[in-house]
Amino acid sequence: MPELRYRSRSYKRIFKKTPGGRTVTHYRRKKPSKHVCAGCGKPLHGVPRGRPYEIRKLSKSKKRPNRPYGGYYCSSCARKVFKKEARS
């Protein structure tokens, strides 16, 4: 029986074969879902997905695209926002 904390499905079960021939279960935290555009819901490019402790280690330029609304809107939706701002 696994430990109580590993019974939850927030852990991914990885089955590993040991050199002795036994199969053991390793528990690993699942990866977070991809970031999506606030406008259209498409997955964003250039935004890494990982647990907070992994993202913390990255430099600022690797965390999100370096442009206005980077990491929030996809390029096509950002273009629409720029046009709307310029016209108003």
Swiss-Prot record:
Stored Pfam families: Ribosomal_L34e
A Gene Ontology term for the protein's cellular component: ribosome
Keyword Transcription regulation: no
Entry superkingdom: Archaea
Signal sequence, start to end: none
InterPro entries, per the entry: Ribosomal_eL34, Ribosomal_eL34_C_sf, Ribosomal_eL34_CS, Ribosomal_L34e_arc-type
Keywords for the protein's UniProt record, in alphabetical order: Ribonucleoprotein, Ribosomal protein
Gene Ontology MF annotations: structural constituent of ribosome
Swiss-Prot/TrEMBL GO biological process terms: translation
Matching Gene3D superfamilies: 6.20.340.10
HAMAP family found in the cross-reference section: Ribosomal_eL34 (MF_00349)
Family statement drawn from the similarity comment of this UniProt entry: Belongs to the eukaryotic ribosomal protein eL34 family.
PANTHER family: 60S RIBOSOMAL PROTEIN L34
UniProt-recorded name of the protein: Large ribosomal subunit protein eL34
Organism (species): Methanothermobacter thermautotrophicus (strain ATCC 29096 / DSM 1053 / JCM 10044 / NBRC 100330 / Delta H)
Taxonomic placement: Archaea, Methanobacteriati, Methanobacteriota, Methanomada group, Methanobacteria
